[in-house]
């Protein structure tokens, strides 16, 4: 994206439209690239002096925008700026400033000589090193140029992303690449709504301007979605943008697709939470499917993260990214009214609200799997079960005469009987306690319920310890 001061748009009659670069700006883009080409081995400050010569009252935002895009491209891909100093500037400054404020040239020279002796160098080298890491002092050491056409297209993408940073909401339609787009929405943690309009699946994404906190973080994630939309064969974007306390509408479609690059936005995505969820649920005996297809219900649709198979029925689970109270409340209402078997989970520290929403499982550090299982059971028809030991999945709610032991519900008197037998036998190995549990139809998951835990002391060897 570009800094807000480089936002270059046209506003008229409640509409806003970015002033995209085109073939008329080819020569300007070429000149900016040429400055970087000829700037190898020179200071960044010198490059900027040359670039300012290209500026006038009409094009200064575009010139500076081209430079910013070129710099971003440099940092990511094609060039490098290095410090022109054999000393580390930060250490030099720390040592110089330890001597306090100097009031004369004589004092200044004395401090420089002292620091030079410390680093075994000359005062001139110390003076050069003092601010060698400032932006204007950095040296351009490598540059693989873009073509003017690519620079123009990358600039247009950055300008569009910057225009949309203050969006209240973004509504779009794409003809294809739906799975890529929806996966991006989820991985970026964006607040969204899917609905049908005239046979088309429309997507409405909440903009950063609606949030009271985390605006910058959400806005950057929001911007990263745009390239995924633009890669579709056909697309349409409509945005409501807040600008200087006024609301503007921006509408663009694939008729201007040639103004943008065909780039795939790299997403840094931490899948640890999803991997842990799948692993834990599988350990609890559930069959879990990751990233199932979009689930439609009436005119609405949802992008679940998981599908849990309960016999011949699927229950969907969605872990929300960023959220507000209103967003979660509306989503929960739609789930309820559509009768979709979907469980909504939200992380407290990603929220912009009081987190007081019914029918949403909230968590801070770890997902409360007990609540998830309880919610899953609401979707499973309860069987009439009898027996001393019953698998938990057969109960929607465990009767009071049973005690939960891992994946099992054990009749209370039988539970006490097993507990006494374990205490009398005083097990020391995993095999000792497993033998007792097996007699009653219980597995390893029940061990903790009886006051013991497993400690592995080697490959394939474990001992039993009391938990208290």
UniProtKB/Swiss-Prot annotation:
Residues 168-260 are annotated as: Central domain (CRD). Keywords: DNA damage, DNA repair, DNA-binding, Endonuclease, Hydrolase, Nuclease. Residues 1-146 are annotated as: N-terminal domain (NTD). Residues 270-372 are annotated as: Nuclease domain (NUS). One of its GO terms (molecular function) is DNA binding. The keyword DNA damage applies. Its EC number is 3.1.-.-. It holds the Pfam family DUF790. A divalent metal cation binds at residues 275, 305, 318. Its cofactor is a divalent metal cation. GO terms for biological process: DNA repair. It is an enzyme of class 3 (hydrolase). InterPro entries: Bax1. Residues 400-468 are annotated as: C-terminal domain (CTD). Belongs to the Bax1 family. PANTHER family: DUF790 FAMILY PROTEIN, VNG6129C. Primarily a monomer in solution, forms a heterodimer with XPB. Has 4 structural domains; the N-terminus (residues 1-146, NTD) interacts with XPB and has one nuclease activity, the central domain (residues 168-260, CRD), the nuclease domain (residues 270-372, NUS) has the other nuclease activity, and the C-terminal domain (residues 400-468, CTD). A dual DNA endonuclease probably involved in nucleotide excision repair (NER). The N-terminal nuclease domain (NTD) of the XPB-Bax1 complex cleaves on one side of a DNA bubble (which presumably mimics DNA damage), while the NUS nuclease domain cleaves the other side, respectively called 5' and 3' nuclease activities. Interaction with XPB blocks the NTD nuclease activity. In the absence of its XPB partner, Bax1 has weak 5' nuclease activity. Binds to and represses the ATPase activity (and probably also helicase activity) of XPB2. This is Endonuclease Bax1. It comes from Archaeoglobus fulgidus (strain ATCC 49558 / DSM 4304 / JCM 9628 / NBRC 100126 / VC-16). The lineage of its organism: Archaea, Methanobacteriati, Methanobacteriota, Archaeoglobi, Archaeoglobales. The gene is bax1.
């Amino acid at each position: 994206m570009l800094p807000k001061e480089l936002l270059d748009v046209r506003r008229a009659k409640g509409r806003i439209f970015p002033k995209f670069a085109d073939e008329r700006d080819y020569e300007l883009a070429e000149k900016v690239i040429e400055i970087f080409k000829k700037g190898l081995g020179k200071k960044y400050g010198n490059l900027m002096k040359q670039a300012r010569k290209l500026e006038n009252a009409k094009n200064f935002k575009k010139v500076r925008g081209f430079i910013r895009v070129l710099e971003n491209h440099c940092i990511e891909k094609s060039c490098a700026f290095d410090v022109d100093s054999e000393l580390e500037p930060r250490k030099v400054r720390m040592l110089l400033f330890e001597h306090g404020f100097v009031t004369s040239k004589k004092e200044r020279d004395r401090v420089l000589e002292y620091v030079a002796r410390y680093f075994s160098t000359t005062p001139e080298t110390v003076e050069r090193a003092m601010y060698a890491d400032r932006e204007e002092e950095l040296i351009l050491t490598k540059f693989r140029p873009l073509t003017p056409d690519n620079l123009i297209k990358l600039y247009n993408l950055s300008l569009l992303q910057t225009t949309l940073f203050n969006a209240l909401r973004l509504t779009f339609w794409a003809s294809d690449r739906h799975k890529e787009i929806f996966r991006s929405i989820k991985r970026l943690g964006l607040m969204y709504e899917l609905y049908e309009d005239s046979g088309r699946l429309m997507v409405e994404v909440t903009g950063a301007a609606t949030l009271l906190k985390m605006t910058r973080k959400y806005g950057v994630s929001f911007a990263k979605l745009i390239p995924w939309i633009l890669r579709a064969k056909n697309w349409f974007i409509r945005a409501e943008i807040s600008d200087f306390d006024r609301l503007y509408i921006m509408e663009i479609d694939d008729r201007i697709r040639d103004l943008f690059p065909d780039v795939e936005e790299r997403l840094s995505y931490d899948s640890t939470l999803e991997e842990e969820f799948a692993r834990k649920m599988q350990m609890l005996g559930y069959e879990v499917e990751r990233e199932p297809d979009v689930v439609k219900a009436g005119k609405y649709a949802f992008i679940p993260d998981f599908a849990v198979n309960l016999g011949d029925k699927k229950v969907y689970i969605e872990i929300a990214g960023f959220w507000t109270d209103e967003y979660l409340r509306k989503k929960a209402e739609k789930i309820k009214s559509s009768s979709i078997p979907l469980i909504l989970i939200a992380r407290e520290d990603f929220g912009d609200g009081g987190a007081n929403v019914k029918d949403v499982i909230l968590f801070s550090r770890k997902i409360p799997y007990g609540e998830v299982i309880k919610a899953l059971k609401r979707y499973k028809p309860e069987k009439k079960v009898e027996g001393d030991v019953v698998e938990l999945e057969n109960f929607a709610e465990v009767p009071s005469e049973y005690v939960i032991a891992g994946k099992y519900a054990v009749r209370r008197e039988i539970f006490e009987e097993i507990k006494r037998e374990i205490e009398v036998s005083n097990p020391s190995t995993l095999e000792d306690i497993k033998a007792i549990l097996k007699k009653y139809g219980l597995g390893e998951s029940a061990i903790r319920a009886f006051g013991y835990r497993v400690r592995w002391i080697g490959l394939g060897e474990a001992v039993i310890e009391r938990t208290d």
